Swiss-Prot record:
Forms homodimers as well as heterodimers with other crh protein members crh2 and crh3, but not crh4. Dimerization may be necessary for the transglycosylation activity but not for elicitor activity. Residues 361-391 form a propeptide. It comes from the Eukaryota. Dual chitinase/transglycosylase that plays a role in cell wall architecture. Chitinase and transglycosylase activities are coupled. Required for the polysaccharide cross-linking at the septa and the cell wall. More specifically, transfers chitin to 1,6-beta-glucan in the cell wall. Acts as an elicitor that triggers AMP-triggered immunity (PTI) and induces host resistance against Botryotinia fuckeliana. Cell death-inducing activity is independent of its transglycosylase activity. Plays a possible role in infection cushion formation. It is a lipid-anchor; GPI-anchor. This is Crh-like protein 1. Chitin binds at E124, K206, W210, T227. Pfam families: Glyco_hydro_16. It comes from Botryotinia fuckeliana (strain B05.10). InterPro entries: ConA-like_dom_sf, GH16, Glyco_hydro_16_CRH1_prd, Glycosyl_Hydrlase_16. Disruption phenotype: Does not affect development and only slightly increases sensitivity to Congo red. Leads to a weaker plant cell penetration ability, associated with impaired infection cushion formation.
Length: 391
């Protein structure tokens, strides 16, 4: 994500998105910080079914949900920066989402992975560019250069939903659009400075939209001119509202934990401690996926109409991050079941996300169902027989 020196008020305004490389509540490379709650398995969110308990709404954010278009991130005024964040972290993983970016010069739509020590992996879209998406990364908050971004072509990302995927492992990070790899970043790529700037610490998924250039004056202000140039110029709010849409998000945590802890101040992935075992409601997949499964949604153009219904409206308040009810159960929505089924059984790609059952949980995490074969049953019977003889 493009960053520049910004005022304290702007930091609040951008709700943690634009300032991602320069701010963290507690930096584990500087001091001991609290452990991060882990997703620890597969999490599926279907925003066309309404609000999800697996996402927290940031202060000042009002969200609406549409039965066709999903979550709506709306900018109408200069102080709007709608943002939501997941309740859990991943330690390497695969993240897929169906997004239709917001229009509007100066408007930025963002989908990012961010860690406590300022590692970051991005998908972003500029409202003035209806032909490209942007992918980027940062390590340990290093913003000394802005030469890491790439802009792969994508057909009308502002008018059309597309599948955007990040597959993140200790060896590489791969960005996909509609199942096609558009960038591969190796751990030891020259831009990572021998791996030092390679993102490698527990990540939290955030998404939202924000104003990259608030006014004509900002275009010439030395503190904001760089971001204004990147965002395409000043926003004209009279042309709004400007809306980013997200249909769904699928997160596979490759770690096996209920929480992740930094073992020292290095920020190296080998120092991260995973504790608690896999989630009681999900199991991590192998971190070797090689392509994207365009499982849910459609690549065809989707237009908003006056007939579409808003399911609900939610206003954000501050709350602590929590893993949720790992042992609790709840009924999945029809949309979540369909999404999970598509991911596990009806894709044509070589995604290694494990096949899962669609029995429920409070975090859309699915636990693989164990099946016993004849040999297993035979061993059980033999064991019971021997136990009887001993008695």
């Amino acid at each position: 994500m493009r960053s520049s020196t910004i005022s304290a008020s702007a930091v609040v305004l951008l709700s943690g998105l634009a300032s991602a490389q320069t701010f963290t509540d507690c930096n584990p490379t500087e001091k001991t910080c609290p452990s991060d709650p882990a997703i620890g398995g597969l999490q599926v969110t279907d925003f066309t079914a309404g609000k999800s308990s697996y996402w927290e709404v940031e202060d000042g954010t009002t969200m609406s949900y549409d039965g066709t278009l999903g979550a709506q991130f709306v900018i109408s005024t200069a102080t709007d920066a709608p943002t939501i964040k997941n309740i859990g972290y991943i330690m390497f993983g695969r993240i897929e989402t169906w997004v239709r970016a917001s229009a509007g010069t100066g408007i930025v739509s963002s989908f990012i992975l961010e860690s406590d020590d300022l590692d970051e992996i991005d998908w972003e879209w500029l409202g003035a560019n209806n032909a490209e998406a942007e992918n980027n990364f940062f390590g340990k908050g290093n913003t000394t250069t802005y030469d890491r971004a790439q802009y792969p072509a994508v057909a009308t990302p502002i008018d059309t939903f597309h599948n955007y995927t990040i597959d993140w492992t200790a060896k590489s990070t791969i960005w996909y659009i509609d199942g096609v790899a558009v960038r591969t970043l190796l751990y030891d790529d020259k831009q990572t400075v021998g791996g030092k700037n390679y993102p490698q610490t527990p990540m939290l998924v955030k998404m939202g939209s924000w104003i990259g250039c608030a006014s004509k004056a900002a275009e010439t202000d030395s503190a904001t001119a760089g971001t204004c140039s990147w965002a395409g110029g000043a926003v004209d709010l009279t042309q709004g509202p400007f809306t980013m849409y997200v249909k769904n998000v699928t997160i596979q945590d490759y770690g096996c934990a209920t929480e992740y802890t930094y073992g020292d101040l290095t920020g190296d992935y080998t120092s991260i401690k995973a504790t608690g075992g896999c989630s009681a409601d999900g199991s991590a997949a192998s971190p070797s996926a090689s392509s994207s499964s365009a499982a849910s949604g459609s690549s065809s153009s989707t237009k908003s109409s006056s007939g579409s219904s808003t399911l609900s409206t939610v206003t954000g308040t501050t709350s602590a991050i929590a893993v949720g009810t790992a042992t609790g159960t709840a009924t999945l929505s029809a949309g979540e079941k369909a999404t999970a089924a598509a991911i596990s059984g009806s894709t044509t790609s070589s995604s290694t996300i494990a096949k899962v059952t669609t029995t429920s949980d409070a975090n859309s995490l699915k636990k693989p169902k164990h099946e016993y074969g004849m040999i297993d049953l035979g061993v059980m019977v033999l064991g019971l027989g021997l136990g009887y003889l001993v008695m």
